[in-house]
Amino acid sequence: MKKLYTFLAMAMLTMMTFTSCDVDYEDRMEARTLEGTWTGYIDNYYYDRWGLSGSSYRTAFYFERENPYGGWGYEVDYDARRPSDYWYCEFKWEVAHGNIRIQYYDRDYTDVVIYDYMLDEYHFSGNMDDGYCDTRTHFSLDYDKAFNWGYWTRGATTRGASDEYHATSTGCFAKE
């Protein structure tokens, strides 16, 4: 009987060495799925002295992979009723440990982490946090092969053009 228990223990230990959670593999697959253009809505919610307040805008993200875990891209947030009111910025991104980190090239904007997200070939939704504000940002996007970036990117500088890159914003998105 003792030999049977020893054999079972050795078999279980052997099986455990062959099973593992490959976080790197999952991150690579998420980065591969993320590549392309995603369009939808971004919602910001916060509490002010009158209660819950917020705003909702159309948004589009473009993700280009440079390595297995990340790359570069750009984002535009705009008012669907007035597309000339928009915010456009380029960024670097990386998938690490199940989160997506976005670092905006414009240093006036803080980096964000996308967490608690759901991503498949057709839909991408989740939450963003910059670590500073009490604002809750939720987004819901669909994969979009036909989005026309021309309106927003024609006046944009190329990524890495200078250390003084600034986002482009007009109308209600312009900083005062």
Please provide the spans of the model-predicted regions:
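Bacterial N-terminal signal peptides that target proteins for export
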Residues: 1-8
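Tryptophan-anchored aromatic micro-motifs
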Residues: 30-56, 91
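Small side chains
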Residues: 9, 36, 40, 71-73, ...
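Beta-sheet ligand-binding and adhesion/scaffold domains
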Residues: 98-176
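Bacterial Sec-dependent N-terminal signal peptides
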Residues: 3, 14-41, 164-176
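N-terminal glycine/threonine-rich, aromatic-flanked beta-hairpin/loop signature
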Residues: 49-101, 105
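Surface-exposed or flexible loop/turn and strand-edge residues in extracellular/cell-surface modules
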Residues: 16-18, 35, 58, 97, ...
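N-terminal leader/targeting signatures
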Residues: 3, 14, 57-59, 120, ...
